[in-house]
Amino acid sequence: MSNKINTRALISVMLCFFAMGFVDLVGIASNYVKKDLMLNDATANIFPSLVFFWFLIFSVPTGVMMNKIGRKKTVMLSLLVTIVALLIPIFGESFMIMLIAFSLLGIGNTLMQTSLNPLVATVVGGNHLASTLTFGQFVKAIASFMAPYIAAWGATQAIPSFGIGWRVLFPIYMAIGIVASLLLLFSHIHEEKSATVQGSSATVGRQFAECFKLLGRPFVLLSFIGIMCHVGIDVGTNTTAPKILIERLRVSLDDAAFATSLYFIFRTIGCFTGTFFLRIINNRLFFVISVVMMLLSMCGLLVGTSKLILYVSIALVGYGNSNIFSLIFAQALQNVPEKQNEVSGLMIMGLFGGTVFPLIMGLASDAMGQAGAVIVMAVGVIYLFTYSKNVK
């Protein structure tokens, strides 16, 4: 009976990872909004930056909240906020509507990322945590690479779009979010008392202080910066890859949307194969191989002008960046096992890199073309290479 319950819980958690991938629609969505509202790069990049801004604000409070209400209830709340975020764009595409929708999408994803990863540790712990988190990222990547296709099909009327064009993406993902919510609601997940009540007698202010104090540990701080670089490269490639194809190959946005899908296809392949490689290959070696792939990718994206070189470069960064988050996150959780909720909050706060990188990349690309954006991402890749010596 226990195995059956654990299997059901694991399935529900994996569907939540799929819902977590909804946030990656912001990359292709911002390109369509840029086209429809005639925005420049710096203004259009406000949308992905806004989504990830909320990781800075809500990650640590979510970690504290988990101590009060538990991990499962926090994930349920995140799904509710995400569903509302996906509902709003159905009714219009004004700048303000999109700002509100992307803000709520960012808040919901902050709650989800902070609580879902520790929930996985509740369902599957021990040596299988990193590989299970990687498999969750594989499921998440499926939602990520489907988004550009669904948006393009809606824009070209290849599928019924109900008069809203590319925005048909939102109601489709909203329906899946509702299914994920119901499945998790009816799944029994036993949480240890220490995971939900520990620290409840302390004041909220003291819990915040204890959480931020963890950044005083060198490994936690280095991991925090590593997460910032990972997500900066992720969001940066998501938004910049189509622009590179448009700039250098002179293709339309609908055709360039394939670049985002290609990135997430190889991220998906990377997560899936990484699930197995992490069981047989040393974590540090696999991390170094992944970062070297990204370094090669940055070189290709910086100087490449042919379709083959650009596609290979996008594939390399997709595969290389696919397992970085899981490796860093698992290392951080295992470094401070008695403070997993707090560490999770700090690591997810590092996703604020998804705000910092696109803003700098937007300014760089307006000044230097898309090569400027690639240089910004390359700085993040170089940091990850220096971080690799800390991976155990």
Give, region by region, the residue ranges found by the protein language model.
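Intracellular juxtamembrane helix-capping segments at the cytosolic ends
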Residues: 111-125, 322-337
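Cytoplasmic helix-loop-helix junction between adjacent transmembrane helices
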Residues: 101-138
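Conserved MFS/SLC helix-loop-helix module at the cytosolic interface between two early adjacent transmembrane helices
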Residues: 57-96
